[in-house]
């Protein structure tokens, strides 16, 4: 699913919004966004 795609891109899933210093890189599920840390 999309969740494993997120982890493969070294991202993580966050509820509704991504924490600061991260970028939205997709969706994990209906309410969870895939977030990626800014390096």
UniProtKB/Swiss-Prot annotation:
Which cysteine pairs make disulfide bonds?
Answer: 6-28, 13-34, 18-35
Keyword list (alphabetical) reads: Antibiotic, Antimicrobial, Disulfide bond
Q: Which GO terms describe its biological process?
A: defense response to bacterium
Q: What are its GO cellular component terms?
A: extracellular region
Presence of keyword Disulfide bond: yes
| Transmembrane residue ranges | none
* Annotated InterPro entries: Defensin_beta-like
Briefly, what is this protein's role? Bactericidal activity; inhibits S.aureus and E.coli.
* Entry protein name: Antimicrobial peptide CHP1
Give the organism's phylogenetic lineage.
Answer: Eukaryota, Metazoa, Chordata, Craniata, Vertebrata
């Amino acid at each position: 699913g999309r969740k494993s795609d997120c982890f493969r891109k070294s991202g993580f899933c966050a509820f509704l919004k991504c924490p600061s210093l991260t970028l939205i890189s997709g969706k994990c599920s209906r309410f969870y966004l895939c977030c990626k840390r800014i390096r």
